[in-house]
Amino acid sequence: MDGMKQVGGVWLPEHETHLVAWMKKMNQIVDGKLSYQLDKRNLALQYVKNWRTAVDVGGHCGLWSMDLAKRFEQLHAFEPVALHRACFEKNVTGANVNLYAMALGDKDGAISIHTSVGSSGDSYIDGAGDIPLRRLDDFDLQDVDFIKLDCEGGELPALRGGEQTLLRCHPCVIVEQKPGRAQKFGLPETGAVAYLQSLGAVLRTERSGDFILSWD
């Protein structure tokens, strides 16, 4: 496994440069550590009604989960890349944290992940492999009040695999839908947003390619 480094109190892959530059530029500090997308996260959390269970799909190094684990009673995070999980485990601690070594989709399978040197957050599903792919619904999570999805174009399949969870729990959802990402997989650019709306979710706002939806 490649190495890790600590920047502003946060563990990241040794090769990471993009996030380092961005986090230092923004210089947002939470609990004495550099934070990532703090304003966007706080915007989304305004629409959370209860604080029982959060789900982080594309947990990466825990940059969102560091905060979510302190706000919610339970946190479930899914991250398929071993190096990212190693960073996550250093960044996010607590008995309420559950980290799963897999990706989420709309079927069971096994996939590979392409990782980008210098910008680890740009990792995406890249064909078949040996990393487990599972459906969120198979975990039968209860009282899910918040879901964050950032899986570089794979958001729509991940949501489809969690349809029963979405309909049962009506969580607040923030989903990334940046231009060109979903199209790599032959999916509509904002297909995940349209899918959530088809289930009854209401689009609340959008910020730099991330869409926030919740149920009335």
Regions found by a protein language model. Name each.
Residues M1-A95, A192-Y195, L203-D216:
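S-adenosyl-L-methionine
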Residues G8-R41, A95-Q142:
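Glycine-rich adenosyl-binding loop in Rossmann-like folds that engage adenosine-containing cofactors
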Residues V55, H76, Y100, P132, ...:
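Conserved Rossmann-like nucleotide-binding pocket used by diverse enzymes
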Residues G59-C61, A82, D106, C151-G153, ...:
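Short, glycine/acidic-enriched loop or turn micro-motifs at the edges of active sites
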Residues L68, F88, I113, A158-G162:
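Hydrophobic packing residues within well-ordered alpha-helices of enzyme cores
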Residues R71-A77, D137-D216:
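Conserved acidic-Pro-Pro-aromatic motif
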Residues A86-C87, G109-A110, A182-F185:
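Short, charged, surface-exposed secondary-structure boundary motifs
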Residues V92-N96, L166-C169:
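Short helix-capping segments at alpha-helix termini
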